[in-house]
Amino acid sequence: LFRSVALSWIALSLMGALPYVLTGALDSYVDAVFETVSGLTTTGSTVFPEVEHLPYSVLLWRSLTQWMGGMGVLVLFLALMPKLGDGAVYLMRAESPGPIKSKLVPKVGSTAKILYGIYVALTVLEMACLRIAGLSWFSAVNHAFTTMATGGFSINNTSLAGSSPAVMWIITVFSFLAGVNFSLLFLAATGKLRTALRSEELRVYTTIVVSVTLLICVCLRVQAGVPLGESVTDAAFQTVTIMTTTGFATVDFALWPTFCRMALLVLMFTGGCAGSTSGGMK
């Protein structure tokens, strides 16, 4: 089963590279495979020096590869679960982005459907919020895909620089949710919110986000003279997107004070919760 997961990723990577080559976006198949693997693994690295000149179809495909890779190949689960029976538990362990201590529901197939349903619902909700906040539908769809996957591909050369505070806060909230253990989101979705909130992992995750946000906010306000409102928004946005390895940027934080940069560096390694779409050590 572990071999099946590995072979599936390889096959998806090789096939997913074809749109880049067939559309002429990339001349090299090797570059196309790199871009696809970067998307499916939500790494976020790219071979494109600029992306704004790319056709909408290619931009959408880039974002879609990250969204598909964000929760693993749950579609594959839905197809294989009935045939694999109890063996599917081991497949989920091989594919899931974090440790699984127990089954969320008695049947693994039902678990996969529920988790994927939560993933889709949050993605659609973010699309709607971003559209209301002023983004075009195309931009809202692409950034919702890559936010929930914590991948960070953007359709803009400058990522999300120049975005309104409303857009930044929406991205911040959904990046935070994407960094939460999906088993806790499952509990919340099934009416067990109090049980989810009692999770020690969630408390530590939230404490780190809030604490680092406040520290960076104070640092920006005192050392860099950034206005209070702007410092709060920038600090929260970069803290969450960096910790969850979403990787969006609205400012050049390389110019921030040393303390801020060191704090963000540590967060990159920390990552979000186990069982989330985020990267890092979790």
What are these regions (language model features)?
Residues F2-K282:
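Membrane-proximal intracellular helices of multi-pass ion channels
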